[in-house]
């Protein structure tokens, strides 16, 4: 056996020699998604964490599929395309109906594809085994960092596009209906940043197609905060109580929700009401032009959101004034208290191979 504690790094994988040679059958896995609006530092934080010595066991890093988004689909740059459409819509040069069905919704579904695919692969290896509560990390444990959760492309970004006027309601519902099922014990680190600092970073890095649209940045940030509020609300509210409160929502609730998401910086609530959650978008009342006509469809979307989001554990990381190292240390603190899974050693080996191939084909 090689010397314990020696580290080998390969393709987004870092593991101790103990892990490489130990034949015991099971490993504990902490699956930690790092997410948030673009430009808040999530990728830098995850990569910094991969290099820190604080975690004793194996570390895996699944990259954001930037190559896939910018090169895969017929040579089109999906990130550039969707930002250009939103810019044209904001300037009044493109009507929402022109932009939405053939452009924003379609591009957003394309962006979601690699995230959905790999999420399915991950849970093929990890989802069928026993679940464990939090425990201090040991040399046999695996920390699996994933850059973006599928909910980013299937929920948070579409909600922001709808709130800022680039996506129509029917197209939003189409995207929400495609949210993948998420097993229990899924952990998300939600990174947040002052919008002015976020805009400065976006301009400074100068990625092709990325623009600073203040309305959209505000809507996107608040869609993530409302995701956290929704999860908190669901963990405190029974499903019958949710349905009762949902039926009481009005078009006035929706208008207030839109206004606040576009104009103010919302904060995660300890005990959020339903009008501070994403359910506020799905008001059923007859005054809402969408509500009565789509009531049956909306009821299924409410059920889907309730089932999926209740399973999440979200850790909030305000990154204002923090270095990448400080953010990475916070992520490690979250990992020590996060719920975890166990899976067989052979499954981990297969997962490592899948991660390396995914990063080579799709990663940034």
From Swiss-Prot:
Keyword Nucleotide-binding: yes
SUPFAM superfamilies: P-loop containing nucleoside triphosphate hydrolases (SSF52540)
Binding site for ATP: 36-43, 201
Catalytic function, reaction form: thymidine + ATP = dTMP + ADP + H(+)
Species of origin: Infectious laryngotracheitis virus (strain Thorne V882)
Protein task: Catalyzes the transfer of the gamma-phospho group of ATP to thymidine to generate dTMP in the salvage pathway of pyrimidine synthesis. The dTMP serves as a substrate for DNA polymerase during viral DNA replication. Allows the virus to be reactivated and to grow in non-proliferative cells lacking a high concentration of phosphorylated nucleic acid precursors.
Family: Belongs to the herpesviridae thymidine kinase family.
Binding residue positions for substrate: 108, 207
Location of the active site: 64 (proton acceptor)
Record keyword Kinase present: yes
Gene Ontology molecular function, alphabetical: ATP binding; thymidine kinase activity
InterPro entries per UniProt: Herpes_TK, P-loop_NTPase
Enzyme class, broadest EC rank: transferase
GO term, biological process aspect, one: TMP biosynthetic process
Name listed for the protein in its UniProt record: Thymidine kinase
Pfam families in alphabetical order: Herpes_TK
């Amino acid at each position: 056996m090689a010397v314990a504690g020696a580290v080998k790094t390969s393709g987004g994988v870092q593991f101790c020699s103990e892990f490489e040679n130990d034949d015991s059958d099971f490993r504990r896995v902490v699956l930690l998604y790092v997410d948030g609006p673009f430009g808040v530092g999530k990728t830098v934080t995850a990569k910094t964490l991969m290099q820190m010595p604080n975690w004793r066991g194996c570390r895996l890093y699944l990259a954001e599929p930037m190559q896939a988004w910018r090169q895969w689909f017929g040579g089109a740059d999906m990130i550039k395309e969707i930002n250009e459409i939103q810019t044209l819509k904001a300037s009044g040069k493109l009507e929402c109906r022109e932009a939405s069905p053939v452009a924003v919704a379609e591009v957003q579904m394309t962006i979601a594809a690699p995230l959905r695919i790999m999420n399915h692969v991950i849970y093929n290896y990890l989802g069928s085994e026993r679940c464990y509560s939090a425990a201090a990390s040991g040399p046999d444990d695996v920390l699996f960092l994933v850059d973006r959760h599928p909910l980013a492309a299937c929920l948070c970004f579409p909600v922001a596009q709808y709130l800022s006027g680039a996506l129509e309601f029917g197209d939003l519902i189409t995207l929400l209906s495609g949210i993948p099922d998420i097993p229990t014990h899924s952990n998300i680190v939600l990174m947040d940043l002052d919008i002015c600092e976020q805009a400065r970073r976006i301009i400074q890095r100068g990625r092709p197609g990325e623009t600073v649209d203040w309305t959209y940045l505000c809507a996107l940030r608040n869609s993530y905060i409302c995701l956290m509020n929704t999860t908190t609300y669901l963990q405190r509210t029974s499903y019958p109580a949710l349905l009762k409160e949902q039926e009481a929502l009005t078009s006035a609730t929706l208008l207030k929700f839109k206004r606040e998401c576009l104009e103010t910086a919302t904060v995660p609530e300890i005990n959020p009401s339903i009008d501070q959650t994403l359910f506020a978008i799905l008001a059923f009342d007859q005054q809402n032009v969408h509500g009565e006509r789509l009531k049956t469809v909306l009821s299924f979307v409410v059920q889907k959101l309730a089932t999926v989001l209740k399973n999440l554990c979200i850790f909030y990381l305000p990154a204002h004034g923090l270095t990448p190292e400080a953010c990475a240390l916070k992520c490690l603190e979250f990992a020590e208290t996060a719920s975890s899974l166990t899976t067989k050693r052979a499954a981990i080996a297969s997962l490592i191979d899948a991660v390396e191939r995914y990063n080579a084909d799709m990663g940034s």
